[in-house]
């Protein structure tokens, strides 16, 4: 198995291990984060109904404007601020953070810190 495949399998194992322990509710939805090489995505998910309450990503025009590159920590921080703003508009202040198997470092940490600075608690 190649080293890339091993990393992907390890991430999926971490993802399932974390997902068994946390769930989102209407009062405290799950803040799910996904990152690719060029973009980062965040969603607020109510697991009882399976509904996405709010989402933000570097593909959105309001987040992407002013960024020269969308795959770095600066872009992740803008996504964190945007998802926090959308959550506060829906009167959501507390969430459960789901790093989706990614290590809490770099872009994931930047998104989480920006969301906390803009009013979300987790």
From Swiss-Prot:
Cross-referenced InterPro entries: Ribosomal_uL18_bac-type, Ribosomal_uL18_bac/euk
GO cellular component, one term: cytosolic large ribosomal subunit
PANTHER family: 39S RIBOSOMAL PROTEIN L18, MITOCHONDRIAL (PTHR12899), LARGE RIBOSOMAL SUBUNIT PROTEIN UL18M (PTHR12899:SF3)
Record note on quaternary structure: Part of the 50S ribosomal subunit; part of the 5S rRNA/L5/L18/L25 subcomplex. Contacts the 5S and 23S rRNAs.
Keywords assigned by UniProt, alphabetized: Ribonucleoprotein, Ribosomal protein, RNA-binding, rRNA-binding
Function: This is one of the proteins that bind and probably mediate the attachment of the 5S RNA into the large ribosomal subunit, where it forms part of the central protuberance.
MF terms (GO), sorted A to Z: 5S rRNA binding; structural constituent of ribosome
Entry protein name: Large ribosomal subunit protein uL18
GO biological process, one term: translation
Pfam family, one: Ribosomal_L18p
Family statement: Belongs to the universal ribosomal protein uL18 family.
């Amino acid at each position: 198995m190649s080293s890339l495949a091993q990393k992907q399998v390890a991430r999926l194992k971490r993802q399932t291990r974390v997902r068994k322990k946390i769930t989102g509710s209407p009062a405290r939805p799950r803040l799910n984060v996904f990152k690719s090489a060029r973009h980062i995505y965040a969603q607020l998910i109510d697991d009882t109904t399976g509904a996405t309450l709010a989402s933000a990503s570097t593909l959105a025009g309001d987040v992407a404007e002013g960024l020269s590159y969308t795959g770095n920590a600066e872009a992740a921080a803008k996504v964190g601020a945007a998802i926090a703003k959308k959550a506060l508009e829906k009167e959501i202040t507390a969430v459960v953070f789901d790093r989706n198997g990614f290590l809490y470092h770099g872009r994931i940490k930047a998104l989480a810190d920006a969301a906390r600075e803009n009013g979300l608690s987790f």
